[in-house]
Amino acid sequence: MNLHEYQAKQLFARSGLPTPVGYACSTPREAEEAASKIGSGPWVVKCQVHAGGRGKAGGVKVVKSKEEIRAFAEHWLGKRLVTYQTDANGQPVNQILVEAATDIAKELYLGAVVDRGSRRVVFMASTEGGVEIEKVAEETPHLIHKVAIDPLTGPMPYQGRELAFKLGLEGKLVQQFTKVFMGLANIFLERDLALIEINPLVITSQGDLICLDGKLGADGNALFRQPDLREMRDQSQEDPREAQAAQWELNYVALDGNIGCMVNGAGLAMGTMDIVKLHGGEPANFLDVGGGATKERVTEAFKIILSDDKVKAVLVNIFGGIVRCDLIADGIIGAVAEVGVNVPVVVRLEGNNAELGAKKLADSGLNIIAAKSLTDAAQQVVAAVEGK
């Protein structure tokens, strides 16, 4: 679960980290009033969406008058912002952040993720702030400096100083950087985060550090013990199909193709998308129904897949390990009949009672095509989309 920039900065401020004075606003009038609270300009106005690339899309602007603030708010509030990180529909702008402008001398980067290889929280710092860290990692990886947090000791001040020295910081900036590092690390651990990022962390013209941007990603599996983070969730920024899937414990990610995919197991789901692509098809989604593929969950999965108007056929790929394929077949038949599926459905069953499951599908009288193998399933669903 992602948070908005203004929410991330609220958490930063509570931990004593330096952030610009700013207010999240839902109306043009609130935006003007926020500017008055902040004081004399210039100000920075930012669209609040769960996506990067806002500046290039016109969603961030430096303004010098309240009239410009009102015009920016009137233009964006209630609209959708499209960036290189969103789909073609973009994301809704329900709030804008009005902040005091900052005089920037240098931009840095500081962030942390969970590194599954080392099983540690790893902090990354770079002198290349204001740039996507993925781009820095690809083009100039030597400019990214890392430290891993030992789970027994937790974050240590010397690690912050080590990163500061590698960034070429001196004097009071080393102390300030160490404070920011320790604050971020504590937020990461206490809030059960999966990602935390300040990009850029800037050195002002007065020689101080300030968190100019903030990005937080919470671990969805830990939200049950983070009630205040749950309250910060903005479902308007999420794909409604993904939100509906989460309610049924289905893992769904919307894609741009026209072949709906329903699979049990994340690895098998990725392999299914690969083989569909290999045979010339375009997956419309990733959907993992998990090990408990009951009739109810299969029915809900069909509803979610078919709510995408682009879907022209559905491929169901089930491996019966613990679950029995004949019971899965009953669920598929019931779901197709209940939902009223009007597109071809190709089903591949393998494993426990697969032959019995295939027979049930064949005898159902519904528009269900039983595939003999995964390759056959991919070929048949692609052919169905192409009208062959």
UniProtKB/Swiss-Prot annotation:
Per UniProt, where does substrate bind? N264, G321, I322, V323
Note describing how the cofactor binds:
Binds 1 Mg(2+) ion per subunit.
Q: Name one GO cellular component term.
A: cytosol
Q: Which GO molecular-function terms appear in the entry?
A: ATP binding; magnesium ion binding; succinate-CoA ligase (ADP-forming) activity; succinate-CoA ligase (GDP-forming) activity
Q: Which UniProt keywords apply?
A: ATP-binding, Ligase, Magnesium, Metal-binding, Nucleotide-binding, Tricarboxylic acid cycle
Q: Which residues participate in ATP binding?
A: K46, G53, R54, G55, E99, T102, E107
Look up the record and name the cofactor or cofactors this protein needs: Mg(2+)
Pfam families in UniProt: ATP-grasp_2, Ligase_CoA
In short, the EC number is: 6.2.1.5
Q: Pathway of this protein?
A: Carbohydrate metabolism; tricarboxylic acid cycle; succinate from succinyl-CoA (ligase route): step 1/1
Q: What is this protein called?
A: Succinate--CoA ligase [ADP-forming] subunit beta
Which domain of life, per UniProt? Bacteria
Subunit structure and binding partners: Heterotetramer of two alpha and two beta subunits.
Name of the top EC class for this enzyme: ligase
Entry function? Succinyl-CoA synthetase functions in the citric acid cycle (TCA), coupling the hydrolysis of succinyl-CoA to the synthesis of either ATP or GTP and thus represents the only step of substrate-level phosphorylation in the TCA. The beta subunit provides nucleotide specificity of the enzyme and binds the substrate succinate, while the binding sites for coenzyme A and phosphate are found in the alpha subunit.
Organism annotation:
Cronobacter sakazakii (strain ATCC BAA-894)
Per its record, the protein catalyses: succinate + ATP + CoA = succinyl-CoA + ADP + phosphate; GTP + succinate + CoA = succinyl-CoA + GDP + phosphate
Is Ligase one of the keywords UniProt gives this record?
A: yes
Q: Which GO terms describe its biological process?
A: succinyl-CoA metabolic process; tricarboxylic acid cycle
Location of the ATP-grasp domain: 9-244
